[in-house]
Amino acid sequence: GVGAKSDQVIVYQPSAFAGTAAAISKAPLQVLKDQLLVRSLSAYGAVLPKEIDDTVFAFYGTTLSGTPQQEERWKRGVTFTTGALADDISKIYVQRHFPPETKAAADELVKNVVEAMGRRIDQLTWMQPQTKARAKAKLANFTTKIGYPDQWRDYSGLDIRAGDALGNAMRSSEFEHLYQYGKLGGPIRKWEWFMTPMTINAYANFNMSEIVFPAAILQPPFFDPNADPAINYGGIGAVIGHEISHHFDDQGAKYDENGRLADWWTPEDLKAFEAAGKALVEQYNQYEIFPGAHVQGALTLGENIGDLAGLTIAYDAWKHSLGGQE
């Protein structure tokens, strides 16, 4: 449908589709109609009459999430607008808060932390040369996205009308769906980001072999080009190291330098890596969040590796930047 030219798609969770199909086949027609109605009302509740909006929030906001009351109207308006026009609003944010000199400083710091990871790999005593070579190849093949995308989305085809909040919401939803469907059968849009420049976060994308740092996280207190380097390496440097390390954690380590699931470890090295991971799991299992509740180390392993390795290589990068000085 929708003009798709490809008859092949990658389904990450086949069981979800099978389960959904089974549930739909068993459900009475009226139940399916009711489900679609409820989903539509919840999706557009914010721009429907107040009674519907309040009912939707009472369930999704208060009952399910524990939020006692809605945000102020203007904040909700900002959230709605930035969701519909993310790139256009992001361009304004970048112009105001991320000047070229800040991007240049961030580019340099990311490069330094990536290089520190390479030196760390070289120093590993438990990893054999062939595995080190593959790990270094993976590191060298990273794409680093810093601040904002090289290409912005075009919203000229989106029809926005004053005084028509519901219509704008529905047209925006349709516009987004058609944009996503338009990717079918086409080349991979490597320039595309999966997080807006206004987001205070960062991410590692295993399939694309990339690390991404939006402009909003490259701000104080994480990053300030005028601050002492130690502050920046301890702040954003640890975040950069964290995302780099995700590509080599218990999940990221399953992907090769091309972003493909592949077994690139020697059996001996993989065994040593898994043993180290098990030790970290056991360490975190001992941490008590509050009386009687312990961290489940197996569930947090990837983040724990990211935190531990990330801070370590950020420190290494800072020490290296001193050029031997103390």
PLM features: what roles do these ranges have?
Residues 82, 86, 90, 241, ...:
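Amphipathic alpha-helical core segments of compact helical bundles
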Residues 1-108, 112:
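Noncatalytic, helix-rich "gating/capping" subdomain that lines the substrate-entry/channel surface
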